[in-house]
């Protein structure tokens, strides 16, 4: 709430609804509120990821079953759960956008289970795009590079990843939240 409410105020919006993506009832309640308020939906930006930050240290091989399941649920399956409900409000088509990272394609130090989750997310995007394209709903993922976010703060040596990106990206700098 401490981050979302100021953002809503900055956008002159009084609508701030809770949505726990690990709970189907919470997701249903969220979309019911959207339906009552607007009746339809044009787009969704899925910018959700989570993993136990202690398991982003060391090696992927040490990932616990509990964290694997929770990370996949929050970071990947949540997109599918949101698409299931959003499509009902996108009667004239729409756009669903999620965020990925190069760690989905290649090994990145300390990214561990998040790399697996982002790989699964990217594959989910392809299948969701196939299913929902018939309903004129586009589903895409963007991978803008490492960005300083709350989720990124849990990754060990994230500063190193940012610096590496600054030296190796075509822009010779990291992408900002505002650019995305």
Feature-to-residue mapping (PLM):
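Short-chain dehydrogenase/reductase
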Residues: 1-66, 154
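A short C-terminal helix-loop "cap" of Rossmann-like NAD(P)-dependent dehydrogenase/epimerase domains
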Residues: 9-13, 155-169
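Conserved Rossmann-like nucleotide-binding pocket used by diverse enzymes
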Residues: 17, 44, 72, 138, ...
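Structural signature of beta-strand start/N-cap positions in the alpha/beta core
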Residues: 40, 95, 138-140
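Catalytic loop of short-chain dehydrogenase/reductase
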Residues: 49-88, 95-134, 146-148, 167
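Short, flexible catalytic-loop segment of classical short-chain dehydrogenase/reductase
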Residues: 139, 143-154
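A conserved structural motif in NAD(P)-dependent oxidoreductases
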Residues: 169-180
